[in-house]
Amino acid sequence: MKCIVGLGNIGKKYELTRHNIGFMVVDRLVESYNLELNQQKFKGLYAIAMINGEKVLLIEPMTYMNSSGEAVRPLMDYFNVSTEDLLVLYDDLDMPPGRLRLRQKGSAGGHNGIRSLIQHLGTDQFKRIRIGIGRPTGHLKVVDFVLQKFTPDEMIVMDKVINQTIKAVEAFIAGERFENIMNQYNGDV
C-alpha cells in the first residue's frame, strides 16, 4: 500500500493558504478520483482507495503543521505502511511558486511539519515533493506570509502546479522508479 500525505493546518481560516498546498493537492486528488477523505483516526483524516489498480492511503493530519508526525506515524503503523511507500507533499519557501522539487530523503530544511515527521518516524528516509510558494517581500513576516491565501494570479500558477504534482503522485502510485519521476517532474511547471 502506498501512502500519500499532504501537510497543512486544520480549520477553515487556513484553507487555500500557502502553508496548506499539501492539503490542496490531496484534496484535488480525492476530488479527481471521486473519493471522500472522511475517515478519522489517530488525529488524521484519511481515505483508502484503489487508484489505477493500486491500494493507496491518503492522509491529511488533523493536527497543526508542527505536529504532523503525531497523526501520520500511528496511521502508518495501523495500516502497516513502510516509509519506503510514503510520499509527503508540502510547501517550500525557498523555491518560487511554480517549482517542484522531488527528493528521496533529506533533512527538514527548516520545515516544522517535516521535522515532526522525521522525529515521529525516526528517519528522514522518505520521499517528498516540495512545492514552491516563494518568500515574503518587504517587511512581511514569514509566519504571516505562509498563512495568507494565494493571490488570484498565484492561484493560476498553483493550479498548474497542483495538476503537475498529481501526475508525479500518480507515477509514484503506479510504481515507477522514483529517480525517473524526479527527472520528469523536478523544476518549473
Swiss-Prot record:
Query: Which GO terms fall under molecular function for this chain's record?
Result: peptidyl-tRNA hydrolase activity; tRNA binding
Q: Where does tRNA bind?
A: Y14, Y64, N66, N112
* Catalysed reaction equations from the record: an N-acyl-L-alpha-aminoacyl-tRNA + H2O = an N-acyl-L-amino acid + a tRNA + H(+)
Q: Which GO terms describe its biological process?
A: protein quality control for misfolded or incompletely synthesized proteins; rescue of stalled ribosome
List, from the UniProt record, the residues annotated as the active site of this protein. Answer: H19 (proton acceptor)
Q: Where is this site: Discriminates between blocked and unblocked aminoacyl-tRNA?
A: N9
Give the chief site where it resides: cytoplasm
The protein in question is named Peptidyl-tRNA hydrolase
Q: Where is this site: Stabilizes the basic form of H active site to accept a proton?
A: D91
Q: Which GO terms describe its cellular component?
A: cytoplasm
